[in-house]
């Protein structure tokens, strides 16, 4: 899945960052959402609705291991914070307060995702992501 999303740092909207989400499998129904992703000085809250249900809805999805590949598009001053490799994690749907700080994601079987980027509860911009 290829996503374009907004960066948010120190309450200022930054440049767009391309992120590639490569899941080992897709399973489950309904929506999924992430915890805030905090790497270096960046804080990003990413919520995706995979064509069914609403973000934060009652439907729970199974665990989905995946890789969040952080690209080299970030400026060089933050490259060491973001890294050039990947983060592999698993996260279960539900109340985000009960899950770890570093974001994991729940996926469902939809070819198109509506991507909402927000930080500190403030909506920033919608984008589209499609399965690769």
Swiss-Prot record:
Changing residue 112 to G: Associated with low viral load in HIV patients. It comes from the Eukaryota. Expressed in lymphoid tissues; Detected in spleen as well as in B-cell lines, NK cell lines and activated lymphocytes. Disulfide bonds: none annotated. The level of circulating virus in the plasma of HIV patients (viral set point) varies among individuals during the nonsymptomatic phase preceding the progression to AIDS. This polymorphism explains 9.6% of the total variation in set point and is associated with the HLA-B*5701 allele, which has the strongest described protective impact on HIV disease progression. However, it is possible that HPC5 polymorphism, and not HLA-B*5701 allele, plays a direct role in the control in viremia in HIV patients. HCP5 is localized within the MHC class I region, but is not structurally related to MHC class I genes. HCP5 is related in sequence to human endogenous retroviruses HERV-L and HERV-16. It has sequence homology with retroviral Pol genes in HERV retroviral element; thus, it is itself a good candidate to interact with HIV-1, possibly through an antisense mechanism against retroviral transcript. This is HLA class I histocompatibility antigen protein P5. It comes from Homo sapiens. The lineage of its organism: Eukaryota, Metazoa, Chordata, Craniata, Vertebrata.
């Amino acid at each position: 899945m290829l996503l374009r999303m907004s960066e948010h740092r120190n309450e200022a909207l930054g440049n767009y960052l391309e992120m590639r989400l490569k899941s080992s499998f897709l399973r489950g129904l309904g929506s999924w959402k992430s915890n805030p992703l905090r790497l270096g000085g960046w804080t990003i809250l990413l919520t995706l609705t995979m064509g069914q249900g609403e973000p934060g809805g009652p439907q729970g999805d199974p665990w989905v291991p995946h890789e969040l590949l952080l690209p080299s598009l970030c400026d060089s001053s933050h490259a060491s914070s973001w890294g050039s490799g990947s983060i592999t994690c698993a996260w279960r749907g539900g109340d985000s307060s009960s899950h770890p700080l570093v974001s994991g994601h729940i996926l469902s079987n939809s070819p198109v995702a509506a991507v909402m980027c927000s930080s500190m509860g403030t909506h920033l911009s919608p984008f589209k992501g499609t399965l690769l």
